[in-house]
Amino acid sequence: MPQNEYIERWQKQYGERLDHEERTRKRIAREAHKQSHDAQSFRGLRAKLYQKKRHAEKIEMKKRIRAQEEKNVKSSAPNEPSSTPLPNYLLDRSQETNAKSLSSAIKNKRAEKAAQFSVPLPKVKGISEEEMFKVVKTGKKTAKKSWKRMITKPTFVGADFTRRPVKYERFIRPMGLRYKKANVTHPKLGVTVQLPIISVKKNPQSPMYTQLGVLTKGTIIEVNVSELGQVTASGKVLWGKFAQITNNCENDGCVNAVLLV
């Protein structure tokens, strides 16, 4: 047992003091007095930190009290039905309702909304710069300059991409590692379609990799889903949708992704 747990060891061997419950009750009762004394006596940074902590505690306590009060509150509409029609979002309030069920429905809607933005791979392994970039030596005779980097991972460049002059190009993206299409799987339909990549939305490794269009595991890409014939609620054809890469493209030689629906 660690040396600093001698009190716990003593309690296990001999039991607690006979007045343990009484002392605990008195300590809890004195807590409010101690908090008041600390709030009045602390000065400087210590006072600011203490005030911030108490502020957060009070907010949490008020939330708990409000949730407890709203738990079983019932509301009922007037007995006489109104002649004016009600909109859809007010129809569920015409009969006696329970506030608890209403609040749980709101929470479920929020959870569904949060699930829309959840991704298949929430965490990915970090990639070091040594693995991502290969140093390219330059210099006419000595080859002493080493400011250029060659990207060793697959990349995506748009159709309107033009290389900078070789003399000023810092990051080199090899032609053999450029991908234009991805094998996208629809999670609900269970079909895999090869779709053209529109852009790289976010690379989890670094914003610089997003700017360079590097395709690594966990990267969010935008793909052209017009071939799938998906439409919005208003009837418009969906053009681009996000997908997350699920494989190591440099090992497999292709880009596999799951559509975010």
Swiss-Prot record:
Residues 74-86 have a biased composition (Polar residues). Residues 45-56 have a biased composition (Basic residues). It holds the Pfam family Ribosomal_S8e. Keywords: Nucleus, Ribonucleoprotein, Ribosome biogenesis, rRNA processing. Belongs to the eukaryotic ribosomal protein eS8 family. Ribosome biogenesis protein NSA2 subfamily. Involved in the biogenesis of the 60S ribosomal subunit. May play a part in the quality control of pre-60S particles. This is Ribosome biogenesis protein NSA2. The gene is NSA2.
